[in-house]
Amino acid sequence: MQTVTMYTGPFCPYCTMAKRLLHAAGVGHIDEIRVDASPEAFAEMQQLSGQRSVPQIFIGETHVGGFTDLYRLQQEGGLDGLLNP
């Protein structure tokens, strides 16, 4: 299974929903990076994703996007293939 990295923030309902969806898909561990605690992490997230909002989700080296993008990927049947290439 690919490594899953998620940039998150405090009190983020979309972060919580994304974590639940990923755990339901069989992801046992998510590398969570809190951008509120580190300006460097926020800058890194922006550089890698081009976005300023959380969550930003990466599966392996692939930038999935936010929760809506992750949900769409799951609904279209592409999440499992990305998690288990």
Curated annotation (Swiss-Prot):
InterPro entries: GLR_AS, Glutaredoxin, Glutaredoxin_subgr, GRX_bact, Thioredoxin-like_sf. It comes from the Bacteria. It is found in: Cytoplasm. Keywords: Cytoplasm, Disulfide bond, Electron transport, Redox-active center, Transport. The keyword Protein transport does not apply. Its main location: cytoplasm. One of its GO terms (biological process) is cell redox homeostasis. GO terms for cellular component: cytoplasm. Residues 1-85 form the Glutaredoxin domain. One of its GO terms (molecular function) is protein-disulfide reductase activity. CDD domains: GRX_GRXb_1_3_like (cd03418). Disulfide bonds join 12-15. Pfam families: Glutaredoxin. Monomer. Has a glutathione-disulfide oxidoreductase activity in the presence of NADPH and glutathione reductase. Reduces low molecular weight disulfides and proteins. Belongs to the glutaredoxin family. NCBIfam families: GRX_bact. This is Glutaredoxin. It comes from Neisseria meningitidis serogroup A / serotype 4A (strain DSM 15465 / Z2491). The lineage of its organism: Bacteria, Pseudomonadati, Pseudomonadota, Betaproteobacteria, Neisseriales. The gene is grx.
